[in-house]
Regions:
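Periplasmic/cell-envelope proteins involved in peptidoglycan metabolism and beta-lactam response
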Residues: 1-273, 364-374, 524-574
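Beta-lactam-recognizing serine transpeptidase/beta-lactamase-like catalytic domain environment
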Residues: 25-26, 97-99, 249, 253-294, ...
Length: 574
């Protein structure tokens, strides 16, 4: 009897019913008041489920949108690799490594994993006494994940690891290191914490340096680390001797514009990722804009010779001691003869003599020369930090003052490139730190004949008794050049001393600019001046910038493999 009853009440199971037992039960008892309320509750469950699912969907869409918009801002906090950009190596002309990405770590703290806070803080204080323990404790008390220290070096990472604290999380990332510290600070620039270039070469070539297809091919610069180190050391030494507030140097190949060295002082260690805001740290060679003084006299003389208005031997007569131009009185720093040759005017560096040559040229031709040399345009160079030459109006006396380098402010980079063109046969070149097949722009600013004459005069600036650059007459290197002593633009209490040299002057290969900001008389320095030992008593460029340029050329000459026949015949051949 019992078996038959069970068989009678049995119902067939429908596989398509999603809630068979529940629905069947409700169907049977729908009219019951208690179960009627249960039926209403089911609708509420569906509604709550729908709202919860909608919120989850909205949140997921928002996270996806934000991560796509700026993926580098989203990192995993549970010891998973941070997504930082890989970058190519940077090497110098001799394949010396100067920048590379390495695997490094950030140290973070997960407060929820700390078992004994006091003991944890004691460990941190003992091993890292410079970290702000009070601030760390406040952050721990908030209970949120935070960074203890970013960009750990290997020693710091090992010390933290040895603490054995689970709350310490190590996030791996790609760190950019610069193998020579501050040596290339104004050239290489820096990257941010996500390895995106923010200054210098790192910013200018950012896209190329992040190119995945080129990761195994280093970016090769024209710089020479040995020469960069030598020039930087000598310039640092000079700043101490002459108590200068700043300095700069630039060495360039006169024939193709390749920059072998670029130094700006003071510099800074680019591995420290410090925010540099003090203007004393600007790149003085490419960003600084200065009145460079008498180095402009070479431009004036070259243009006059090119226009066949004068020759090096042309005598300029009736040179006055002073000239009044508009409201300004122009004079020389010392008394010169009333009649001098064009060559002597440049060798002795006469303002008034140069002014009289410029008047022969005329304003329009001088304008055309400046335009052809791009001296008033932003320079073309593979760095982000480029200065803008100051614009001016060609009013009365402008031609006269520009002729000797006052009233016109440009970058040292532009001045050096123009000297390269004047001495390489007249060919305009584009300065570069990247080797390229074609660097000349096929323009000439002067003829080969004019260029040869200028080289001859620049050599005499160094060798002649009345020349202003005798201290650069380095045995065997045939140095020529021109000095410039001027006041800093906008502050007549500060001075800038510059020397641009070319060597060997008979067939120039290199041009070297050396500049010192606010140098003082080095009264304790003993100069070897024309075979005599004398103490320093003067403060013009000929007594500081020229002196240090000579020291630099003497040391880098062998590195550049310049054939020093005098030295060879005297010390090697015998």
């Amino acid at each position: 009897m019992m078996k038959k009853k069970q068989k009678k009440n049995k119902k067939n199971f429908n596989i398509n019913q999603t809630s068979f037992y529940f629905e069947d039960y409700l169907e049977t008892n729908k009219k019951n008041k208690i179960f009627k309320n249960s039926y209403i509750s089911q609708d509420r469950v569906y509604l709550l489920f729908f709202l919860f699912f909608s919120l989850i969907l909205i949140f997921a869409i928002k996270i996806t949108f934000l991560s796509l918009k700026n993926p580098k801002n989203y990192i995993y906090k549970n010891n998973i690799t941070q997504f930082t950009a890989l970058r190519r190596d940077i090497i110098d002309r001799n394949d010396v490594l100067i920048s590379r990405n390495i695997k490094s770590y950030h140290a973070a703290i997960n407060p929820s994993l700390i078992k004994d806070k006091d003991n944890f803080l004691i460990k941190i204080r003992i091993n890292f006494p410079n970290l702000p323990i009070e601030l760390i404790e406040k952050k721990i008390n908030k209970g949120k994940y935070f960074y203890l220290k970013k960009r750990l070096n290997q020693n710091e990472k090992e010390k933290l690891w040895a603490l054995g604290e689970k709350a310490l999380i190590f996030e791996p990332f790609q760190s950019r290191i610069y193998t020579h510290g501050n040596l290339y600070s104004h050239i290489l620039g820096q990257v941010d914490y996500d390895n995106y270039g923010i200054s210098g070469v790192e910013k200018y070539f950012d896209k190329s340096l992040k190119n995945k297809e080129l990761l195994n091919k280093p970016l090769k610069l024209t710089l020479d680390t040995n020469i960069q180190y030598t020039i930087s050391s000598e310039l640092n030494h000079a700043m101490k001797i002459f108590r200068a507030t700043g300095g700069g140097a630039l060495l360039m190949d006169v024939n193709n514009g390749e920059v072998l060295s670029l130094v700006s002082l003071p510099n800074f260690d680019i591995n420290k990722r410090e925010k540099i805001v003090d203007k004393k740290y600007i790149n003085k060679i490419t960003k600084g804009v200065y009145e460079l003084g008498s180095i402009f006299k070479t431009f004036t003389v070259a243009l006059a010779i090119e226009k066949n208005l004068v020759s090096p031997d042309t005598i300029i007569e009736n040179i006055p001691k002073k000239i009044k131009c508009s409201r300004h009185e122009i004079s020389d720093i010392k008394e010169f003869p009333k009649a001098m040759s064009v060559q002597d005017i440049l060798v002795r560096s006469s303002n008034i003599g140069t002014l009289m040559i410029a008047q022969k040229i005329g304003e329009q031709d001088y304008k055309d020369f400046i335009k052809k040399t791009n001296l008033l345009s932003i320079p073309e160079f593979e760095l982000e930090e480029l200065g803008t030459p100051l614009s001016f109006k060609w009013n009365k006396c402008k031609l006269e003052t520009i002729s000797y380098g006052h009233g016109i402010a440009i970058t040292p980079l532009q001045a050096t490139a123009t000297y390269a063109a004047l001495t390489n046969g007249g060919n305009v070149i584009k300065p570069t730190i990247i080797r390229k097949e074609e660097l000349k722009d096929n323009k000439k600013i002067v003829s080969s004949e004019t260029s040869q004459k200028i080289n001859s005069i620049l050599r005499k600036v160094v060798t002649e008794k009345e020349g202003t650059a005798s201290l650069a007459n380095i045995y065997g290197y045939d140095v020529g050049g021109k000095t410039g002593t001027s006041q800093n633009y906008g502050n007549d209490k500060e001075n800038l001393n510059t020397f641009i040299s070319v060597f060997p002057s008979q067939d120039p290969k290199y041009v070297l600019l050396v500049m010192l900001e606010n140098p003082q008389v080095a009264s304790n320095l003993i100069y070897n001046y024309r075979g005599m030992k004398i103490k320093g008593t003067r403060n013009e460029a000929g007594w500081n910038s020229v002196y240090i340029a000579g020291k630099i050329i003497e040391k880098i000459g062998p590195i550049l493999a310049i054939k020093n026949e005098e030295f060879y015949n005297k010390h090697v051949a015998k």
